[in-house]
Amino acid sequence: MTDIQNQINQLRNTLRHHEYQYHVLDNPEIPDSEYDRLFHRLKALEQQHPELISADSPTQRVGAKPLAGFAQITHELPMLSLDNVFSDEEFYAFVKRIQERLITLPDNLEFCCEPKLDGLAVSILYENGRLVQAATRGDGTTGEDITLNIRTIRNIPLQLLTDNPPVRLEVRGEVFMPQEGFDRLNEAALARGEKTFANPRNAAAGSLRQLDPKITSQRPLVWNAYSIGIAEGADLPPTHYERLQWLKSIGIPVNGEIRLCRGAENVLKFYRTIQEKRPELGYDIDGTVLKVNEIALQERLGFISKAPRWAIAYKFPAQEEMTVLNDVEFQVGRTGAITPVAKLQPVFVAGVTVSNATLHNGDEIARLDIAIGDTVIVRRAGDVIPQIIGVVHDRRPPNAEPIIFPTLCPVCHSAIVRIEGEAVARCTGGLFCDAQRKESLKHFVSRRAMDIDGVGAKLIEQLVDRELIRTPADLFKLDLITLMRLERMGEKSAQKALDSLEKAKKTTLARFIFALGIREVGEATALNLANFFKNLTALQTADLEQLQAVSDVGEVVANRIYVFWREQHNIDVVNDLIAQGVHWDDVEEKQVNENPFKEKTVVLTGTLSQMGRNEAKALLQQMGAKVAGSVSAKTHIVIAGDSAGSKLSKAQDLGVAVMSEAEFLEIVNSFS
């Protein structure tokens, strides 16, 4: 073997190792930049020596020409579906049927319990360790050949990480799109003026069925294995759970929420636990899959019709329901964004009665081809605002009315414009528009901004409606008599509001910047701006190049900030606020004292009772910590509040230090 070939093989093995550490174990050992450097080194060597390129090289995930269509593949072993249950009683009946066949008490029966991923079932075939074929489930007997697209999914190994691979190994699993990637995909589509996907499952399906693999490679898809089909030349473990762990050991990604449960009661505990975790998993699930763990018992139980007797899907209550669209109202937000809100015939969805749902923007109305009077499909997931994801066009009544997007603001009657490249249409009225003024003032007094206790949304509504305030500075000009004339404002409440306003005059530069409500400037960006410029004058006079030098400030955000300070009325409002006594200390270079969080990676999970997540994050950053969004082997500390979910479980599995909210606050207080 030549020296070049040795280098290439070594690079391939190194890259495969790091892909396994990153995608399967969630334990990256090197930064992305180092992986990229190794990848490009391998790619350069292969380009110089094309005769040494192999199909399983990490560089060969993408590169094939677009297909004319998908070929059909017949599954050697049918890909069966599962029967469903929707209640504890139905689950107990399932267990009883197993008991009658096995003469085994339910308490003694072990189940492998898994989240039911809401994606697409895919079969992947490896021969002598190399990925050679991938197919959709199709009708269970015949699917479509999606091999080229599957090769582009980064967490799927092109070669198994074992020196002794099976002759043939078929692994079955689910391709899905995590919520974060789905959101980014839709945001990018909106920015380009393209159609968006209704939900992550549709996005995953559309991405997998692209005829051009290069398009699929740009989509944030993930695959998790859940079973083995064909296995020739493999000495497989005797239980389903052990088989999944074996798959993981040879590089196949397996879901991290899978648990072993003995007895029906513990299985139901798993169901309820995963249901509670559902909103924070980061990907869609629609239930749990519960499988008899011992393979020998699975074989004894066999199959009925097109489903196994040894497994069941216990589905969650529906997150999608049908109802009728009665009307559409157009609301005006703080930045003038016009949002169409669907007024629905009330319907019970995922435990909540829903009567309103967002329609996002005019493009979404056009995409859905929706009219007033239509029967629509409403989706509610976790804490997400309910949205209409589809229309049952076959049920459209003869008197259905088209939805006309307004050209004038429904509040101030200013022109509505849509800037090229943006999906959102906006009212041009600015602070002349009462709706924008109200929302801007509500933002200004909010806890995360100026934190003015006693001045809430209802009080702001009254003050604006009675033309007592127009700008944030007017709040600090209010007096006791004026406030006491308002509804539900006695002397005590009025004095509390005035005391809060006086207290709020002493603030921080970061809070003040955030309170101004500059588009695209959130708390983290405001903090970065304050730390970078140190004082307001430097920020006001900064040019675009200086603004883009700030962490997390790109071209778009820099332009928003730059334009804000070029508008004279904004300068006037800020000057008026300062004239009313609003002040802060300039940011000084601080030496962070030694503390348990300094130079540590910290993850927050659960609900904190004493402060918001953003406030805790800011405190940690002030103490020199890096605050991450997910737990890995590189996490040093996890701070767990109430209802901590999968992040806490993962931290415990990895042996990461876990700290309670009380312990966190004790440290903060001792070092403040």
Swiss-Prot record:
Its cofactor is Mg(2+); Mn(2+). It catalyses: NAD(+) + (deoxyribonucleotide)n-3'-hydroxyl + 5'-phospho-(deoxyribonucleotide)m = (deoxyribonucleotide)n+m + AMP + beta-nicotinamide D-nucleotide. Its EC number is 6.5.1.2. NAD(+) binds at D32, S33, E34, Y35, D36, S81, L82, E114, R137, E174, K291, K315. SUPFAM superfamilies: BRCT domain, DNA ligase/mRNA capping enzyme, catalytic domain, Nucleic acid-binding proteins, RuvA domain 2-like. One of its GO terms (biological process) is DNA replication. Zn(2+) binds at C409, C412, C427, C433. One of its GO terms (cellular component) is cytosol. GO terms for molecular function: DNA binding; DNA ligase (NAD+) activity; metal ion binding. It is an enzyme of class 6 (ligase). PROSITE patterns: BRCT, DNA_LIGASE_N1, DNA_LIGASE_N2. Residues 592-672 form the BRCT domain. Keywords: DNA damage, DNA repair, DNA replication, Ligase, Magnesium, Manganese, Metal-binding, NAD, Zinc. The active site is at K116 (n6-amp-lysine intermediate). DNA ligase that catalyzes the formation of phosphodiester linkages between 5'-phosphoryl and 3'-hydroxyl groups in double-stranded DNA using NAD as a coenzyme and as the energy source for the reaction. It is essential for DNA replication and repair of damaged DNA. PANTHER family: CHROMOSOME TRANSMISSION FIDELITY FACTOR 18 (PTHR23389), DNA LIGASE (PTHR23389:SF9). HAMAP family: DNA_ligase_A. NCBIfam families: dnlj, PRK07956.1. Belongs to the NAD-dependent DNA ligase family. LigA subfamily. This is DNA ligase. The lineage of its organism: Bacteria, Pseudomonadati, Pseudomonadota, Gammaproteobacteria, Pasteurellales.
